[in-house]
């Protein structure tokens, strides 16, 4: 009497691994390939963990039910013996006809019904186990795919030692480095600026990740020349970006590094740090003429209104008149934070954009962009100009500003 229930109990235990399947449903159609995040992997792992817990709980419940049923069958077998001790034929799935003995017919009928129901449930569980197995295999393949994508993206989030290729990544894909790092200490950080990339062998201009000291990583446009690597901090070329922005925008940066943009005062300050730097200014007019200027500079922090520290010859051309221990100082000014040297006016409101205005009349490379030279002089003064080259009222066609540490002269 115990052998048949025990065999069925074994079948149920084998099939019980599919518990809670009815709540799972069919797998969702595979998503289109895309970059993954750790959150997606965590969601899948959490779902599989919950599924495993549910299966275990269902197995325990089914095991208890089978144990109770087995005990009832054993009790029935003892009660159904004839007075001489001969047992009633064993109750099986194929022998469900009630005995003609004195056993209680209601009890036997109830047990027969339960056995039929259990057999039906076992068949359903076998089917669901097979279905869930296919579902779990698909989930496993998806997790492997996501893990592969995460491994591919790891250079964007880990240090230089995990994948040095992250230092040469251009959108949307990193390029491989030209050679090994110079020393082991460089294996754990990104380059400080474009000049460090140049010193390590990079000769192609483009977009790269850098990380100045004390700053999180960010993307910059590097221009590689025979003089070394230059970090582009501003570009004007087609008027696609509005440069009449508030203080916070000029602090953090705006625009597209591949087109018109302003890198951000705080980023420039971090790149320069305490080192000596030089600023290159490239200008172009509407007749195809070009001018290039270079001069030593230092940029203070936000507590100095990101003041440019300039030497006397250059300072006079830009209108700087504030003496500091480091030289003549020219604070940055916007329409919502006025730091210019005109006490009676706000140069950023009178003109346009944010700039180291001085007395409003020397230069403004972040002014309004005109696609042709306006006729009205009052309108022209709001444009992009550099007084000592094409004059106060000539709006320029294109400008680029670049910085490089002065130590690059010795390195190059």
Curated annotation (Swiss-Prot):
Keywords annotated in UniProt: Angiogenesis, Coiled coil, Disulfide bond, Extracellular matrix, Glycoprotein, Lipid metabolism, Secreted, Signal
Glycosylated sites: 183
Pfam families: Fibrinogen_C
UniProt GO MF annotations: enzyme inhibitor activity; identical protein binding; lipase binding; lipase inhibitor activity
One GO term describing the cellular component: extracellular space
Post-translational modification: N-glycosylated.
Top-rank lineage group of the source organism: Eukaryota
Signal peptide: 1-23
Function in brief: Mediates inactivation of the lipoprotein lipase LPL, and thereby plays a role in the regulation of triglyceride clearance from the blood serum and in lipid metabolism. May also play a role in regulating glucose homeostasis and insulin sensitivity. Inhibits proliferation, migration, and tubule formation of endothelial cells and reduces vascular leakage.
Protein name according to UniProt: Angiopoietin-related protein 4
Organism encoding this protein: Sus scrofa (Pig)
